[in-house]
A protein has these predicted regions:
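A cross-family "folded-core" feature that marks the main globular domain of proteins
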Residues: 1-146
């Protein structure tokens, strides 16, 4: 599965997506897939391991490679964290979330807040909108929501 990508951030996102999809990933296979050294992959996995740890989740390792086993709510938490980190990087963010869908939900939610005369910090709005979008996207891709 050879892939074209533009850099480290994009590669990490693609590896992350494969992990949350349940793939077992070996360093060697990832190095071949992304045309980088095994040491680059080791740094990527280390970065992702820290990301998962921030949500008190763990990547697991066995003879077939690195993998993640978790519930849909755990996937949602770590996916949301990664998305929030990438909000200021449109190209990277668009690999995680459909930007048009995010904008549509964001505008609708903000309109509803104005109509109901509810004030809310922007960080809360971003978090709520992102949660809604992630639920919609994962449900539309037939993911098991638990």
């Amino acid at each position: 599965m050879k892939m074209n990508y533009s850099g480290t951030s994009e590669r990490r996102i693609l590896i992350f997506k494969r992990l949350i999809a349940g793939e077992h990933l070996s360093y060697q296979q990832l190095a071949e897939d992304y045309f980088v050294s095994r040491s680059s992959i080791a740094k990527d996995i280390s970065y992702l391991k820290e990301l998962f740890q921030k949500e008190s989740l763990r990547l697991r390792f066995d003879n077939s490679g690195t993998f993640f086993e978790g519930s849909e709510s755990q996937i949602h938490r770590v996916l949301k964290r990664f998305c929030l980190m990438m909000l200021d990087q449109p190209a990277a963010f668009s690999l995680l979330v459909e930007p048009e869908k995010y904008q549509e939900v964001n505008q609708a939610f903000r309109r509803a807040l104005v109509e109901k005369q509810v004030e809310m910090p922007d960080s809360y709005i971003q978090s709520i909108v992102l949660s809604i979008v992630l639920l919609i996207e994962r449900a539309s891709h037939a993911e098991n929501l638990v």
